[in-house]
A protein has these predicted regions:
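N-terminal acidic, glycine/proline-rich low-complexity segments
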Residues: 1-256
């Protein structure tokens, strides 16, 4: 809140084979996790957190929900709103479907597809491909930070996290605990993809981007490159050292 005017935290659906939860249950689990982070930061007001879509567009889900309603409300009242998406695009796609007029008032920064670098196996893309199609076709201003091989460079280990964070505050201790106990044990390095989206908004000088014509998504979910469609931004480099330096400084600050 000291850097950005955060108006909402919206929960996106997810489903992964490692987690035995339905898509709907994942919304509640993510909501509870967001509330826990608020508690660790001594933030009492959890009204900023909104539950989102309980299924994917690709499964026929087409319902309004608190997250979609809030996205539309915020977009309509502001001249410009940045939406930082670290999951699938279901909530954003439905907001655009229900209120297409917001397209000129929002900009989406998405941890998403890696189609410029070979076969696209990105998790956030595959979760709800129909939502990606809606967002691409809307012509919304869009920046994509591909998971592999770009944001996957944000690799860390429990040794680094404990060296930089452990004992600094409640949140830092919890983040170390979560990293270690999500199967990222002492011998495993793991990328913190999600921090890239926030870092991009903090300092774009840590990134290189290129403008490309928005691709089409084929029926087999591959991409067709184009030349004359609207442009989107695509991140093709990041400075991991600067991003981690800033992250550790902020997490251990007395003002957190």
């Amino acid at each position: 809140q000291k850097i950005f005017n955060i108006e909402a935290i919206t929960i996106a659906p997810f489903k992964h084979s490692k987690w035995q939860k339905t898509v709907s249950e994942s919304i509640d689990a993510s909501y509870n996790e967001a509330c826990k982070i608020f508690d660790l930061l001594d933030l009492k007001d959890k009204s900023l957190i909104y539950k989102g879509s309980r299924d994917y567009l690709k499964n026929g889900y087409n319902e309004k929900n608190p997250a979609i309603n809030k996205i539309i409300e915020i977009a309509n009242k502001n001249n410009k709103t940045y939406i930082l998406a670290i999951g699938c695009l279901t909530n954003i796609a439905l907001a655009l479907k229900y209120n297409p007029e917001i397209v000129d008032k929002i900009e989406v920064i998405w941890l998403g597809s890696n189609f410029l670098f070979g076969p696209n196996k990105d998790f956030n893309f595959a979760q709800d491909i129909e939502a990606v199609k809606v967002v691409f076709e809307s012509k919304v201003r869009l920046t994509i930070l591909p998971c592999s091989p770009i944001t996957s460079n944000l690799m860390t280990s429990i040794y680094e996290l404990e060296s930089e964070l452990k004992g600094k505050n409640k949140l830092c201790d919890y983040l170390c605990y979560r990293f270690y106990n999500r199967s990222h044990g002492p011998t495993k390095r793991w990328p913190l993809w999600d921090i890239s989206v926030i870092a991009y908004m903090i300092n774009k000088n840590w990134f290189n981007t290129i403008d490309i014509s928005c691709p089409l998504i084929n029926n087999d979910n591959t991409f067709k490159f184009t030349k004359n469609r609207h442009n989107i931004k695509f991140v093709n480099y990041l400075n991991a050292n600067e991003i981690f330096k800033d992250l550790f400084e902020k997490l251990t600050s007395d003002n957190i």
